[in-house]
């Protein structure tokens, strides 16, 4: 499992389990809304009136309607931020 999944998977899973509505912004600017039904390494299944399979490489931002509860994951504890440290940005891979 890569380092990025240690934050991404618990966050998406909490949004899925709690059925929190999300807005997903794509890299081309399109805004999708719904609930995360499922996800894997490459795609997110977003459910609204219909289910849409959205490739993760096309996603810019995931904005939940509310914060998920922290469930034993220190990365999701109150006050924790999702922003990478200065030396952990995507440009340094």
Swiss-Prot record:
One of its GO terms (biological process) is regulation of DNA-templated transcription. GO terms for cellular component: cytosol. Residues 74-86 have a biased composition (Low complexity). Keywords: RNA-binding, Stress response. Gene3D superfamilies: 2.30.30.100. Residues 9-68 form the Sm domain. It holds the Pfam family Hfq. The keyword RNA-binding applies. GO terms for molecular function: RNA binding. Residues 74-93 are annotated as: Disordered. RNA chaperone that binds small regulatory RNA (sRNAs) and mRNAs to facilitate mRNA translational regulation in response to envelope stress, environmental stress and changes in metabolite concentrations. Also binds with high specificity to tRNAs. Homohexamer. Belongs to the Hfq family. This is RNA-binding protein Hfq.
């Amino acid at each position: 499992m890569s380092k990025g999944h240690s934050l991404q998977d618990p966050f998406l899973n909490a949004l899925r389990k709690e059925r929190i509505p999300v807005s997903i912004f794509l890299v081309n600017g399109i805004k999708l809304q719904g609930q995360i039904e499922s996800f894997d390494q490459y795609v997110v299944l977003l459910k609204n009136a219909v289910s849409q399979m959205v490739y993760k490489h096309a996603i810019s931002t995931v904005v939940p309607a509310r914060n998920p509860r922290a469930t034993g994951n220190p990365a999701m504890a109150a006050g924790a931020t999702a922003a990478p440290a200065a030396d952990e940005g995507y440009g340094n891979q």
